């Protein structure tokens, strides 16, 4: 009887203990689950990356002359930069290249805001919307151009602009001449080789990526009569066109002689409407074929070079500091305040 009582006591104890033993593992798993959940929440509430920043309202507006309707439109600075980047660089380019273009576009306009432009804009405006300054298109124009891909492309460009908002490129604490072009011949050009003055941060650098650009090579054909008329020269009776007599630091044509007349490479390019001043020519009877390498003046940042750099994993800092040697990325506030004070 005593043994039965002991056995009964043990069974009762086990009955009370088993639920507790069963619950302990589940409580542990529940706590672990809560831990995982809190980690997920922490990740999802991290500050957005630079590329996903929200575009802030611009306190400064740019008076832009819209050539289509011949009127001046005041456009918030960052909205203007979006319209320029969308117009000047393909939206299919890599985000880091788009960021570099945003920095260049913002720097260009901020520099104009605080200094005198060599090119006069229409009355009441700071710039127009053409390549005379920077090409700009409104969101309505971009929607018409892009169609069904409008939302995707606009978001990509807006993210690039937002990630660089308020930032410009400076040299000696001043906004730089942030020139850019489509495709180099494998080298960028010294500023003084294309314009008149040397600029320390616009020096020739290698840009080997550009050889992969669809705009790297092109040909253009002229009749002998067209060629002579456009350049104001007289071809001799030989099979030769002329002789290249000088080369720039960027390996473009500096000078050429045609039947005793010396011409600048830039003038030849502009008068013949060539893609670049790196050219060679060939005469076949009454036909002259000119082959060019590169697209644009070659000074500053190569857009296709920037995109290929981005594809290799280079950042916006890498890109702009490579093409604009010795420059810094700085806040634009001081220059914007100076502009507002003048108004």
Curated annotation (Swiss-Prot):
GO-annotated biological processes: sporulation resulting in formation of a cellular spore
Signal peptide: none
Entry superkingdom: Bacteria
InterPro entries reported in the protein's UniProt record: Bact_Sporulation_Assoc, SpoIID/LytB, SpoIID/LytB_N, Spore_II_D_firmicutes
Keyword entries, A-Z: Sporulation
Record has Transport as a keyword: no
Pfam families linked: SpoIID (PF08486)
NCBIfam families per UniProt: SpoIID_LytB, spore_II_D
Task performed by this protein: May act at the level of sigma-G activity or its stability. SpoIID is probably required for engulfment.
Protein name, entry field: Stage II sporulation protein D
Name of the gene: spoIID
């Amino acid at each position: 009887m005593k043994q039965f009582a002991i056995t009964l006591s043990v069974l009762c104890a086990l009955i009370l203990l088993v639920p507790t033993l069963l619950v302990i593992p589940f409580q542990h798993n529940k706590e672990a689950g809560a831990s995982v959940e809190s980690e997920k929440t922490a990740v999802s509430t991290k500050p957005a990356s630079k590329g996903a920043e929200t575009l802030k309202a611009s306190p400064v507006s740019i008076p832009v002359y819209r050539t289509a309707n011949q009127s001046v439109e005041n456009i918030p600075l960052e909205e203007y930069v979006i319209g320029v980047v969308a117009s000047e660089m393909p939206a299919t380019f890599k985000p880091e290249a788009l960021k570099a273009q945003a920095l260049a576009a913002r720097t260009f306009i901020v520099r104009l805001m605080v200094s005198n432009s060599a090119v006069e804009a229409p009355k009441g405006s700071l710039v127009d919307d053409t390549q005379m300054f920077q090409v700009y298109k409104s969101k309505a124009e971009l929607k018409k151009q892009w169609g069904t891909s409008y939302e995707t492309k606009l978001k990509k460009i807006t993210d690039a602009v937002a990630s660089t908002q308020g930032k410009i490129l400076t040299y000696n604490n001043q906004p730089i001449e942030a020139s850019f072009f489509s495709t180099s011949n494998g080298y960028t050009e010294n500023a003084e080789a294309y314009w008149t003055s040397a600029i320390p941060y616009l020096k020739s650098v290698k840009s080997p990526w550009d050889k992969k650009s669809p705009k790297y090579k092109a040909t253009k054909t002229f009749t002998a009569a067209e060629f002579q008329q456009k350049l104001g020269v007289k071809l001799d009776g030989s099979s030769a066109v002329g002789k290249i007599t000088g080369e720039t630091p960027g390996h473009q044509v500096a000078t050429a002689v045609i039947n005793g007349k010396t011409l600048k490479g830039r003038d030849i390019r502009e008068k013949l409407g060539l893609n670049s001043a790196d050219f060679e020519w060939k005469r076949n009877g009454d036909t002259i074929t000119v082959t060019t390498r590169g697209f644009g003046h070659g000074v500053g940042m190569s857009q296709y070079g920037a995109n290929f750099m981005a594809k290799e994993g280079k950042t916006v800092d890498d890109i702009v500091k490579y093409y604009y040697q010795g420059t810094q990325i700085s806040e634009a506030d001081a220059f914007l305040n100076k502009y507002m004070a003048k108004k």
